Amino acid sequence: MKIITFRFILEFLAAIIMLQTLYFKFTAHPDSVFIFTQLGLEPIGRIGVGIGELIASLLIFIPRTTWFGSLMGLGLMSGAIGAHLFKLGIEVNEDHGSLFLMAVSVFVCCAILLWMTRKDIPFLYKKA
């Protein structure tokens, strides 16, 4: 029971953080537009990342696809962390690093979830 509860907490945290940012991406919030303009990816990148985060969040909650949603989350958050470290800076528009911290939090949750569900990956483990 403790493992299931811990897994649910990780799934919930990763998904809820990614889902709550969708509003800003899909409504073209000025902060979101600023970030993706700085990266040279506005508007295609903003909308594409939003769709990717939506799909990853949904897959994380389906037990058979948690591994794939986690893998997608790792990829998306690697991009976000890399953008913060190499182009944007940790603090963007005086957010005190909250976007960076959320990206790192989702990355850690997804990494642990991927490890916990590694036996569900069909091309790594054959099921009898």
Map each language-model feature to its residues.
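Extended, low-polarity transmembrane helix blocks
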Residues: 1-20, 64-128
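N-terminal first-folded block
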Residues: 2-51, 121
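Membrane-interface junctions
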Residues: 42, 61-64
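Hydrophobic, membrane-inserted alpha-helices
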Residues: 51-59
